[in-house]
From Swiss-Prot:
The lineage of its organism: Bacteria, Pseudomonadati, Pseudomonadota, Alphaproteobacteria, Hyphomicrobiales. It comes from Rhodopseudomonas palustris (strain TIE-1). Pathway: Porphyrin-containing compound metabolism; bacteriochlorophyll biosynthesis (light-independent). Keywords: 4Fe-4S, ATP-binding, Bacteriochlorophyll biosynthesis, Chlorophyll biosynthesis, Iron, Iron-sulfur, Metal-binding, Nucleotide-binding, Oxidoreductase, Photosynthesis. Coiled coil: none annotated. This is Light-independent protochlorophyllide reductase subunit N. It is an enzyme of class 1 (oxidoreductase). Belongs to the BchN/ChlN family. One of its GO terms (molecular function) is oxidoreductase activity, acting on iron-sulfur proteins as donors. One of its GO terms (biological process) is photosynthesis, dark reaction. [4Fe-4S] cluster binds at residues 32, 57, 118.
Amino acid sequence: MTVHVTGCSTATADQLVSREIRTESGQREVFCGLTGIVWLHRKIQDAFFLVVGSRTCAHLVQSAAGVMIFAEPRFGTAIMEEKDLAGLTDANDELDRVVTQLLARRPDIKLLFLVGSCPSEVIKLDLSRAAFRLSQRFSPGVRILNYSGSGIETTFTQGEDACLASLVPELPAQTDTKPSLLVVGSLADVVEDQFARMFEALGVGNVAFFPPRKSTALPSVGPNTKILMAQPFLPDTVRALEERGAKRLAAPFPLGVEGTTGWLRAAADAFGVDPAKFEQVTAPNRARAERALSAFKSELGGRRIFFFPDSQLEIPLARFLSRELDMQLVEVATPYLHREHLAEELKLLPIEVALTEGQDVDDQLDRCRIARPDIVVCGLGLANPLEAEGITTKWSIELVFTPIQGYEQAADLAELFARPLVRRAKLVA
């Protein structure tokens, strides 16, 4: 069943509680959490991500990153051969040897992540014990942690969640009694700098970003820390921070003008910023972003869009496209729907929209074909087959790689959806 949204009425609190959400469990089409290395290795500039996996794992990360291995990026793969999988060698000895060689060759590494994969988990290689053992050997010069990037029952953005959650225990305890703001989730450096300037202009002091650009500059956390989520796919990280005493601020996510304004306002209210000052600081940016967005309304307004579950960005994106660009939501599916973290977003979605958590890919493909939307947001594995059927697609992974948060990027985000439609129109003409 599909729902064709014709209005833009939003959900009240009571309707939010009673909103029907379809839950599906079946065959899925997603990348694994190893994909998160592609943006994390660029973000944490003195870290290295060592995947303990197969040649397939190595090809995935290298291809997704678009980096040739001889360029010495900050990631690599300790490839498990057949003899390792068969138990003919001691995998721990081999891992110790690889790590020793790596750290000798790359003295700039201050933080090493051992990243588990499907093969390493199949043979029950205990990377947590390996990380502890190697940390004792190489500390204090190098901190060694581990997390799982396995694709078993996960989606690709969960790699960042697992990575950051493993880093939370390393954060120093907060000693300052003044309240601090911790922005959680990887942001492009240009976006991070924009937000830092905005917080400074608002008078919100003591702001840190997690993950940091350098592992030697980890932010502190404690009971006076307020968390502002920049990405919706970090439940384990937020839970770990809350266990350290931090408190999450309820806010929409900073996509588009409305989302960015609500996100900034949540921080401003928590830090007692005067509403008049908030208006003074944000109004010029809002106006500029709204003008830039208006150029895309003629192309996107009234177009019907269908979301396959892939990145966990689906609900904030749907809110942005529906409310700011007048697109009609046929179905919005997401791999996992954290109702508490997405509560502010769900309030802003049209009441009639069909929401789906999880995926049965065959059933969802059937619904998509029946609906014949103008554009489909999906993973790479589904994009080419749908394009062959004449359905315009947008790769969901591109929405994670591209800077899309904040006022300055609102029009860039809109263009990501307009571009495939323009391309299709030119091909048909």
